[in-house]
């Protein structure tokens, strides 16, 4: 059965508070599966399985699938619809409260697939990356504007701290755009399926990741300010900061949105050296 048929079969009522929008376009499901490149060696962690339409396809292709679902009304539906699969584990929990490192212990070739309410997208991505979770890739449906921020380049308005965070840890690839007409109920925004492939090493080597991300966040907190003014929040004396900019070869009058990840790395290392 397709998504609409399962929803009607169980007379499922959508929970607006959970931001539920279920994918009904089968071509999008196929593109997610193809883009995620799932095979029989993979353990898949699915966040937000809905009524299990995509989950079935994952179960057919993967070694095992762990699906995380918050809505208690969906649990019996998923249990019934997927009862024939012995490689399926259903976790009834808020994904924001999951210990992903524990869940991933002793598992090889972990790939994540997610179709999340958009309000939790950035927190989930940030946690998976900053907590050093051991996964190969994350294929996720997200709001178009967030995908554009993740996939942005310097010198554009979408480029910001989220861009740097994701691209520090991952290669990014947009798989396809998704119209609101592909969902029930119909959301008010366009969506994009994007894949994040985890790098074996961060894109740049830095002396302190904590300082690196502090510099990045400070540089974007007030986008129209120069780096010199933005980085005053680090509370470093004027002479030391002048020295750091000079050693990094970066003009302090530039704005954060003009710096590449490599330049952020160079600047943070030079600041680290003078602390």
From Swiss-Prot:
<feature type="binding site">
    <location>
        <position position="48"/>
    </location>
    <ligand>
        <name>S-adenosyl-L-methionine</name>
    </ligand>
</feature>
<dbReference type="InterPro" id="IPR020598">
    <property type="entry name" value="rRNA_Ade_methylase_Trfase_N"/>
</dbReference>
<feature type="binding site">
    <location>
        <position position="21"/>
    </location>
    <ligand>
        <name>S-adenosyl-L-methionine</name>
    </ligand>
</feature>
<dbReference type="InterPro" id="IPR001737">
    <property type="entry name" value="KsgA/Erm"/>
</dbReference>
<comment type="similarity">
    <text>Belongs to the class I-like SAM-binding methyltransferase superfamily. rRNA adenine N(6)-methyltransferase family. RsmA subfamily.</text>
</comment>
<keyword id="KW-0489">Methyltransferase</keyword>
<feature type="binding site">
    <location>
        <position position="69"/>
    </location>
    <ligand>
        <name>S-adenosyl-L-methionine</name>
    </ligand>
</feature>
<keyword id="KW-0949">S-adenosyl-L-methionine</keyword>
<protein>
    <recommendedName>
        <fullName>Ribosomal RNA small subunit methyltransferase A</fullName>
        <ecNumber>2.1.1.182</ecNumber>
    </recommendedName>
</protein>
<dbReference type="InterPro" id="IPR029063">
    <property type="entry name" value="SAM-dependent_MTases_sf"/>
</dbReference>
<comment type="function">
    <text>Specifically dimethylates two adjacent adenosines (A1518 and A1519) in the loop of a conserved hairpin near the 3'-end of 16S rRNA in the 30S particle. May play a critical role in biogenesis of 30S subunits.</text>
</comment>
<feature type="binding site">
    <location>
        <position position="94"/>
    </location>
    <ligand>
        <name>S-adenosyl-L-methionine</name>
    </ligand>
</feature>
<dbReference type="InterPro" id="IPR020596">
    <property type="entry name" value="rRNA_Ade_Mease_Trfase_CS"/>
</dbReference>
<dbReference type="InterPro" id="IPR011530">
    <property type="entry name" value="rRNA_adenine_dimethylase"/>
</dbReference>
<keyword id="KW-0963">Cytoplasm</keyword>
<keyword id="KW-0808">Transferase</keyword>
<dbReference type="GO" id="GO:0005829">
    <property type="term" value="C:cytosol"/>
</dbReference>
<dbReference type="InterPro" id="IPR023165">
    <property type="entry name" value="rRNA_Ade_diMease-like_C"/>
</dbReference>
<feature type="binding site">
    <location>
        <position position="23"/>
    </location>
    <ligand>
        <name>S-adenosyl-L-methionine</name>
    </ligand>
</feature>
<dbReference type="GO" id="GO:0003723">
    <property type="term" value="F:RNA binding"/>
</dbReference>
<keyword id="KW-0698">rRNA processing</keyword>
<dbReference type="GO" id="GO:0052908">
    <property type="term" value="F:16S rRNA (adenine(1518)-N(6)/adenine(1519)-N(6))-dimethyltransferase activity"/>
</dbReference>
<feature type="binding site">
    <location>
        <position position="115"/>
    </location>
    <ligand>
        <name>S-adenosyl-L-methionine</name>
    </ligand>
</feature>
<dbReference type="Pfam" id="PF00398">
    <property type="entry name" value="RrnaAD"/>
</dbReference>
<keyword id="KW-0694">RNA-binding</keyword>
